[in-house]
């Protein structure tokens, strides 16, 4: 069985974001790019994806995109791809505060009375980023804690971003109560960090980083992660996996992530596809 016929779930992408292109490459209209990305995802076996918000405007765009693409006649519906969204404030944007997110979340949850109409399936991405420090660290910690509480209050998945902040991330999750469905997005730690997150009850989501030559520690983490706690993602349009580095990423590339994980674990890619899809569906309730 070839990888192209396997079913995959891209648990984290940003299809609302503009795709970077070299200056000499014509930029397609955004709607055309989206339709093309959805069609290629379907061809690659990607049947489900979650579009992730990083701020109030980004989250509103993710929700609108997911809702629009799921309408009859929309590209996702036409290609047999189901899409959901998350609402969240990336640590880079922590200084903006969560008021806009709370209002958007309340409106969306009120709108989706029936589960079949639900678009919002998680809070995030949120967390701590001590590499860039675009927002002061105390503000990052405060806003992360508030979003942990939002996920717990509304029984939604929590999508966590952490970079060079493992100690504070783990401490804040432990102190505020880890939501039942917590996902460490784009996991880039090694075995020690993986065990700390797993001990909290979190799941680990691996991106194209797992294909990078210098990411042996990430592959080791993927190898030790329990199969029922493992998800795959693209983080599109970022972190394009080998051999497509240097081009915009998209959901159709998630099978490359799954294949790299399967190789690291010494198992069949089909088993990684089946498990990661089931895990993502359980985590997001879809």
Segments and roles (model prediction):
Residues 1-286:
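Mid-domain alpha/beta scaffold segments of enzyme catalytic cores
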């Amino acid at each position: 069985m070839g990888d192209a016929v396997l079913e995959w779930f891209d648990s984290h992408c940003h299809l609302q974001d503009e795709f970077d292109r070299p200056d000499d490459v014509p930029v397609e209209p955004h709607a055309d790019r989206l339709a093309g990305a959805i069609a290629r995802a379907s061809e690659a076996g990607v049947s489900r994806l979650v579009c992730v918000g990083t701020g109030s405007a980004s989250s509103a765009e993710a929700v609108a995109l997911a809702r629009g693409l799921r309408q009859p006649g929309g590209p996702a519906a036409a290609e047999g791809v189901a899409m959901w969204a998350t609402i969240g404030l990336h640590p880079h944007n922590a200084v903006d505060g969560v008021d806009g997110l709370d209002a958007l979340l309340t409106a969306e949850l009120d709108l989706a009375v029936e589960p079949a109409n639900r678009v919002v399936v998680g809070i995030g991405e949120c967390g701590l980023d001590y590499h860039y420090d675009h927002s002061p660290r105390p503000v990052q910690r405060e806003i992360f804690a508030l979003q942990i509480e939002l996920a717990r209050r509304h029984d939604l998945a929590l999508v966590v971003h952490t970079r060079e902040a493992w100690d504070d991330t783990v401490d804040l999750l432990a102190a505020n109560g880890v939501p039942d469905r917590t996902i460490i997005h784009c996991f880039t730690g090694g075995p020690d960090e993986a065990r700390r997150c797993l001990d909290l009850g979190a799941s680990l989501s691996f991106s194209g980083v797992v294909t990078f030559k210098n990411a042996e520690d990430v592959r080791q983490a993927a190898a030790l992660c329990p199969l029922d706690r493992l998800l795959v993602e693209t983080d599109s349009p970022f972190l394009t996996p080998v051999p497509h580095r240097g081009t915009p990423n998209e959901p159709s590339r998630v099978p490359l992530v799954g294949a790299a994980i399967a190789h690291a674990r010494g198992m069949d890619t089909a088993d990684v596809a089946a498990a990661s899809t089931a895990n993502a569906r359980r985590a997001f309730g879809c």
